Amino acid sequence: MATIRMFNAVRPAIEKVDRIAALPYDVYNRKEAVEVVKGNPDSFLAIDRAETSFDDSVDTYDDKVYAKAKELLENKIAVGDFVTEEAPMYYIYALTMDGRTQHGFVACASIDDYEN
């Protein structure tokens, strides 16, 4: 049986949400992502598509891209753009698109069932 537990989410500070919120990373090609980040460096896309910090000679999957994403996220946390929830919780969400609503549940889950 799967083991799940609550966790302390890291999320944008309320006063920064409008600048940080971004569409999913996979709706942009690299060139489009660069333009979005250039227009709004606070966008989460700068972290999600950290290759936007490098020229085109750096592969999207290069280790330094992942290191840059880590650096950017840690910096956003350090300056208070992201906050950590004080108490662990489960998270429930609803997404609506084209009149169809999808509900979800977010929690920490053990990987033990996948290792067997």
Give residue ranges: language-model regions.
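A cross-family signal for N-terminal binding/gating loops and helix N-caps
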Residues: 1-115
